[in-house]
């Protein structure tokens, strides 16, 4: 009886031993659940809500319209750059959508540079850097790849699932297109075909250089059994 009791207690102690700590190295980890938490006492996970502050930009120009969205913020040296969609509504596949650009030195006071690149709102006297269906969700990033070429310091993804109209290329296949720019203002496609074709692409599709894995990564929306999901 004593031997059986000892063996049972020993087995129980093995079953309740704490698991070995997970080695995450230098990776950043997002605490969205308790997977990385061994124990907690007197605390809990809480999703913090954003607090509305002062308005720093009003999208009231003729080429911007009432359905601006998908804002991307990039800090390049002393400049804070903000990219967003200009649209008066309508189809996601319209070539009337534009990508706008403003910049600031403090992240509060933004100015619209008069670029003179693309006609929108009846004039080229605007801050538009791209026009076409890809502007529906054009999302740029500053490439931190140590081997990046100077003429490709900025990169972006943009596009929708179904074929759409492009301002100067006619109808283009559906999917996400890759863009490059030396300065964040003058953009061109890396290739004429989309680089990702499987997905919904109806939201902001994010890409970046993953220094941990030494490769580019992208996150976009997809529907799995009619349920919204994220793919990478």
Residue ranges and their predicted role:
Residues 19-205, 209-232:
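Beta-rich carbohydrate-recognition and catalytic domains
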Residues 1-9:
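Sec-dependent signal peptide recognition
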Residues 8-18:
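Hydrophobic h-region of N-terminal signal peptides that target proteins for export
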């Amino acid at each position: 009886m004593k031997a059986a009791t000892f063996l049972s207690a020993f087995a129980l102690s093995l079953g309740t031993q704490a698991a070995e700590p997970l080695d995450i190295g230098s990776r950043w980890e997002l605490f969205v659940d308790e997977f990385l938490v061994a124990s907690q006492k007197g605390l809990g996970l809480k999703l913090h809500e954003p607090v509305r502050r002062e308005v720093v930009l009003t999208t009231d120009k003729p080429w911007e319209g009432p359905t601006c969205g998908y804002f991307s913020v990039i800090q390049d040296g002393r400049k804070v750059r903000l990219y967003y969609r200009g649209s008066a509504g309508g189809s996601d596949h319209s070539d009337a959508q534009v990508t706008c650009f403003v910049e600031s030195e403090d992240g509060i006071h933004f100015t619209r540079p008069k670029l003179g690149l693309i006609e929108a709102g009846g004039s080229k006297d605007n801050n538009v850097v791209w026009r076409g269906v890809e502007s529906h969700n054009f999302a740029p990033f500053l490439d931190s790849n140590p081997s990046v070429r100077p003429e490709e310091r900025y990169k972006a993804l943009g596009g929708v699932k179904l074929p759409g109209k492009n301002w100067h290329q006619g109808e283009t296949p559906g999917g996400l297109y890759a863009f490059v720019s030396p300065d964040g203002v003058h953009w061109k496609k890396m290739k004429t075909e989309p680089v990702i074709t499987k997905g919904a692409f109806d939201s902001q599709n994010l890409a970046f250089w993953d220094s941990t894995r030494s490769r580019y990564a992208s996150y976009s929306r997809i529907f799995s059994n009619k349920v919204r999901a994220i793919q990478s």
